[in-house]
From Swiss-Prot:
Organism from which the protein derives: Xanthomonas oryzae pv. oryzae (strain MAFF 311018)
Cofactor or coenzyme needed: K(+)
Keywords: Cytoplasm, GTP-binding, Hydrolase, Magnesium, Metal-binding, Nucleotide-binding, Potassium, tRNA processing
Protein name: tRNA modification GTPase MnmE
Record function comment: Exhibits a very high intrinsic GTPase hydrolysis rate. Involved in the addition of a carboxymethylaminomethyl (cmnm) group at the wobble position (U34) of certain tRNAs, forming tRNA-cmnm(5)s(2)U34.
Length: 446
């Protein structure tokens, strides 16, 4: 049966035992199944006490039944929620009875998928449901809540609306090719392109911040041996996670440690020191360090403050591929008062704690930009959103270039591709396989 004609059922409450458990039904048979379970009367948006019974009339459980009639429900279909005791055994028995009465087990994310397909929320909002549930702290939860409320989607739609107006002018210029572009609203096209680029740049910046709030930041500690990378990881983590000795090359493998820092998760990766030579085990450690850099959002380049230039030479070009870098001069407590400090680096001492507060501030700035906790526009975002915005930005830039050469057909195509990239975010333009991947990552009852 298709999703539009079948009735689905699943446990909607959290896994495990609890005070209350919820079984959710959605589809045309929801109300009928509830009646057959033993709910004598159902009024929309009213709570009704009932005993839920099996095929022989024995009581499975007792609790509350609520009916949300279409289209005034989460999915846009008839929805019934059966609230009973939070026993996994009883909840599974209740689901099995619903299936006997004509429902089928819901797929992962199918309730949210139906809400999307029925126009109750767009794709970015549907994804935000999972982000609200998975939020690791209050700031991430608030950002996810704003995305669910449509803050992100409305900004995407604003850019899309600007592109629509642009496309109208460019398509008109193509239809009237004998007329100069300026007589067909050339200034409006140029102004519109400027506005679109500005809106996209701002939205991309905020989406990258939202992705950091959702996914955290992957930061790799890199540098020569005995620069104090492991000591710095321990200082940032607030515990002795890495082995620290005075022997160069102590760290041979990678060590991952996740910490909470000002509203986002920072995953620190301690790595083997980079240098020429070393035994086979140390060389393997250095290979793994370089591999970690390829996946890094941020490189924390740790150098010995007493001789940073020599330490910098040992690293070579290993960090060139990492877009964001923070240079740290460790062991600053061992410097004489007259020793000069690099103004582009942060001086710290993992032993005394000197400079760690400044390091925290700089890490936050690199992760979240100049965003302030609690600003109205902060929202959660995902990697696919950021990638789609980057594609849209590239296509708008290309359209601007083509218009400069008066290549109107090519400019129109670039604007169409930019529009399409934005549509992928909200689901206005999405391939079926993309939708399947997104909703299959949800909980069964969501």
């Amino acid at each position: 049966m298709s999703s539009s004609t079948s009735t689905i059922v699943a446990i909607a409450s959290a896994a495990g035992t609890g005070g209350v458990g919820i079984v959710r039904l959605s589809g045309p048979q929801s109300r009928q199944i509830a009646v057959q379970l033993g709910v004598a009367r159902l009024q929309p948006r009213h709570a009704h006490y009932a005993r839920f019974r099996d095929a022989q009339g024995a009581v499975i459980d007792d609790g509350i039944a609520l009916w949300f009639n279409a289209p005034h429900s989460f999915t846009g279909e008839d929805v019934v929620e059966l609230q009973g005791h939070g026993s996994p055994v009883l909840l599974r028995q209740l689901v099995a009875r619903c299936i006997e009465l004509g429902a089928r087990q819901a797929r992962a994310g199918e309730f949210s998928e139906r809400a999307f397909l029925n126009g109750k929320l767009d794709l970015a909002q549907a994804e935000a449901i999972a982000d609200v549930i998975a939020a690791g702290d209050l700031r991430a939860a608030r950002a996810a809540r704003r995305a669910l409320d449509g803050v992100f989607s409305r900004r995407v739609d604003a850019v899309a609306h600007t592109l629509t107006r642009l496309r109208i002018h460019v398509e008109a210029a193509i239809d009237f090719a004998d007329e100069p572009l300026d007589t067909l609203g050339g200034n409006q096209v140029r102004d519109g392109l400027t506005q679109a680029r500005t809106l996209l740049a701002q939205l991309l910046r905020d989406a990258e911040r939202g992705r950091t709030l959702r996914d955290g930041l992957h930061a790799v500690l890199i540098g020569p041996p005995n620069a104090g990378k492991s000591s710095l990881l321990n200082a940032l983590a607030g515990s002795e996670r890495a082995i620290v000795t005075d022997v160069a090359g102590t760290t041979r493998d990678t060590l991952h440690e996740a910490i909470q820092l000002d509203g986002f998760e920072l995953t620190l990766v301690d790595t083997a020191g980079l240098r020429d030579g070393g035994d086979a085990i140390e060389r393997e450690g250095m290979r793994r360090a370089r591999a970690e850099l390829e996946r890094a959002d941020l490189a924390l380049v740790v150098l010995d403050a007493r001789d940073p230039q020599a330490a910098r030479a040992a690293i070579g070009d290993a960090i060139d591929a990492v877009p964001r870098q923070l240079w740290i001069h460790n062991k600053c407590d061992l410097l004489s008062d007259a020793a000069p400090l690099d103004v582009n680096a942060i001086a710290v001492s993992a032993v005394t704690g000197q400079g760690l507060e400044q390091l925290h501030i700089r890490l936050r700035e690199l992760a979240l930009g100049d965003g302030v906790e609690g600003v109205d526009g902060e929202f959660s975002a995902r990697t696919r959103h950021v990638e789609a915005l980057r594609r849209a930005e590239r296509h708008v830039d290309a359209a601007d270039l083509e218009l400069g050469f008066e290549q109107l057909e090519l400019a129109a195509e670039e604007l169409r591709l930019a529009h399409e990239a934005l549509g992928e975010i909200t689901g206005k333009i999405s391939a079926d396989d993309l939708l399947g991947k997104i909703f299959s990552s949800f909980c069964i009852g969501k």
